Amino acid sequence: MKFKEDGIGVSDLLKLIPDELLLDLAAETKVDYQVKKLYGQNVFNLLLYGLLSNERVGLRSLEDFYNSRKFKFLFKLPGTAKSAKYNSLSARLATMNVSYFEKAYQAIYEQCSQLYDEPTLSLKYKITRVDSTMVCQTANKLEQGINVGRKKDGKKQIKYTISLTDMFPSSVEVFTQQNYISENLTIPKAILKVIDKRKDNVFVFDRGVSSREAFCELDKNDCSFVTRLHVDTRHVVLQDLKPAEKPIVRNLTIIKDQMVYLYKTGAKIVEHPFRLIQTTNEKGTKYWFLTNQVDLSSEEIIMIYKHRWDIEVFFRFIKQELNFSHFISVNENGIKILLYMTLILAMLILIYKKINEFGYKTAKRRFAMELEYIIDDYMIEQCGGDPNTHFW
């Protein structure tokens, strides 16, 4: 059953994760080496189904589903143990080869971006928004974590830095060490790891990155970027660029468009040219934009930055609808596995949402319902019945 006959169904999307892919990755990464139960493919299917749950999924609820007739009927592999305890699941998540899930995520991203992605603004370039989000947990539960601020509330935080290329998450980094609280370290690292290496990829991030070394490193690696710069940042003007044909972009008026050198500290100048666009809004508030792109118009630069907000919407989606703020595993290995599985499920739901024209909540709910219909029909057929004779 499909909720939209002219739309896309869950069965179509599940074809993006063929059994052959998971079996090949298991052999490549040796994720099942010396494993007698809880094979990689079992854990993959268990987490994918568990994350669709409306409630906060935990190790005990995963244990219940693993031991259910439905899971055994659908996903049991030869040699799989008949049952599993929550502590066995916890231990397996702590020691599994993360690269199995990382490579699965990368392969599924490639499929999704080739088949379903659409450029946000123009066919001339892709937009990759890069930002970080923090998730906290009580300190005695997390093996590692970051302390933020001076507040001693007994909690630590995990930092996730994610790149969102047009519609899909194209890279991710997990940080648990205190020195990575700075965006000057985390965002460039995530950018350099992006799966989509095309030259027409423009990265956009906020003012959290201010390091001149970070700007230079991105430029030297041919990474086009657009960011905000603190107003009145000291700089040396090298060249005034041609005035914009349309000096008003949305609520901003372009005042200056220049090639500049930026100051570092004191009187030290970083002799690396960047483009600085100065604007003001109707209230006179200043907004400065920095980029290494000279081929795009000032209007395009500003419009690219305005799409940075899309990643905030994505963070809200995975936190509210996919329980991303809830830790199933509290060690770094398990946290990374859950992250990759969350991103895989998010990509499937985003396609389902866009093509069927649903909202986020409706897309997630109907995706889960449609998957249940598929499972029910399959079980009826395997037991010799005809699902079409029933009222659903």
Task: Name the predicted role of every residue range.
Residues M1-L59, L123-K124, Q137-N140, K152-W392:
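Single, function-defining residue in the core of a domain
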Residues L47, E63, S83, S88-S90, ...:
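Short, conserved beta-strand segments within well-ordered enzyme catalytic domains
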Residues V57-P78:
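DNA-recognition alpha helix
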Residues L74-G79, F327-N331:
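Short, surface-exposed loop/turn segments at secondary-structure junctions
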Residues F75-V98:
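Major-groove recognition helix of helix-turn-helix-like DNA-binding domains
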Residues K82-Y86, S132, R207, V313:
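Conformational gate/switch positions in structured elements
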Residues S90-L164:
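Active-site-proximal, Lys/Arg-enriched surface segment
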